[in-house]
């Protein structure tokens, strides 16, 4: 079985209290009531023959509705999530209105075994978080990406 790989973008900006990062909350019934440890950087899976950086930019646009125009990307490397999925990320400096984020959607059977298909957004909301709060919101393995971001910017 090929390992599942995804690629994403850590969008960051200077906020009043220091660095802030944009995180997205997954849509759909499974995630509806989950908050701490449920948020993610905008990301998505890519095929083995696909360029991960191109995938990261495409997925960012699909999940936020915003295209990053010629961003200068800082490579943050890869982390492995609990289920074994590898996430490769790049950081980009930028700003967007988190309240205006609109993502693509997916279809699934809901409620389970009902035979009814429902459509849900890939991302139901996005928000800017200061680093300390972002660390509590992010899926565990992705916290390492924030540490790497801070290191890269400090150089």
Label each region the model flagged.
Residues 15-18, 28-31, 47-48, 83-84, ...:
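Short, charged/polar surface micro-motifs in flexible loops or helix N-caps
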Residues 118-124:
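Non-DNA-binding regulatory cores of transcription-related proteins
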Residues 1-41, 90:
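N-terminal strand-loop-strand
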Residues 131-155:
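Charged phosphate-binding loop/patch that engages nucleotide di/tri-phosphates or the phosphate backbone
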Residues 34-36, 40, 66, 85-87, ...:
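Membrane-topology and secretion signals of cell-surface/extracellular proteins
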Residues 78-115, 127, 149:
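Active-site-adjacent beta-strand/loop module that shapes the phosphate/pyrophosphate-binding cleft
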Residues 33, 49, 137:
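Residues that scaffold the ATP/ADP-binding catalytic core of kinase and kinase-like folds
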Residues 41-76, 130:
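The catalytic Nudix box helix
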């Amino acid at each position: 079985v090929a390992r599942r790989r995804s690629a994403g973008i850590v969008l960051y900006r200077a906020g009043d209290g220091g660095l802030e990062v944009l995180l997205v909350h997954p849509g759909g019934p499974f995630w509806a009531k989950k908050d701490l440890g449920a948020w993610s950087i905008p990301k998505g899976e890519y095929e083995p023959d696909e360029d991960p950086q191109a995938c990261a930019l495409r997925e960012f646009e699909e999940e936020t509705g915003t295209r990053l125009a010629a961003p200068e990307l800082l490579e943050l490397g890869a982390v492995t999530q609990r289920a074994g999925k590898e996430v490769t990320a790049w950081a980009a400096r930028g700003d967007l209105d988190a309240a205006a984020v609109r993502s693509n959607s997916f279809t699934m059977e809901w409620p389970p075994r009902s035979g009814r298909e429902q459509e849900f957004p890939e991302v139901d909301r996005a928000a800017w978080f200061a680093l300390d709060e972002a660390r509590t919101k992010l899926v565990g393995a992705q916290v390492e990406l924030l540490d790497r971001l801070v290191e890269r910017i400090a150089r």
